[in-house]
Amino acid sequence: MSAERSLAPDLAAGSRTDELLGAGTRWLEASSDSPRLDAELLLAHALDKPRTWLYQTLSAVVPTETAARYAALLGQRAAHRPLAQITGMREFWSLGLQVTVDTLVPRPETELLVELALRRIPADMQMAVADLGTGTGAIAI
């Protein structure tokens, strides 16, 4: 069964932002460790708005086409597709990096590794960094 069909009662024409967030959160509870956050990020992506916009417009009616797109995004996430691959973007040290199915998604542990390396390397030391692999180039950046 598709996400669109399963969420149809909650995604009826004229659904508000808060209703869509609630439906999305419920849909992802069985497949995500952070269903509310995932629902928020996916709805913001479907709307092409920042996540903070959602809370400023909880009672706003979401266009039917956008709600359908959101349902499709929820279906991808429920199928365990990484959020960064769905949205095509992942933050790394506050930089927005493009992500595709061909790249490894930067992980929080990698940020910690970079922080540890920067603490141990003298600030005046000249060096070159090679970021090898199939990632986004986040470490070298």
Predicted feature locations:
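Conserved AdoMet
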Residues: 2, 41-119
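Generic hydrophobic secondary-structure packing signal
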Residues: 20, 35, 102, 106, ...
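A general structural signal for well-ordered alpha-helical segments in protein cores
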Residues: 21, 39-40, 70, 83, ...
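A general structural signal for alpha-helical elements within enzymatic catalytic domains
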Residues: 28-29, 75, 122
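Residue-level signal for short amphipathic helical patches enriched in basic/charged
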Residues: 34, 49, 65, 124, ...
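Conserved SAM/SAH cofactor-binding pocket of Class I
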Residues: 109-141
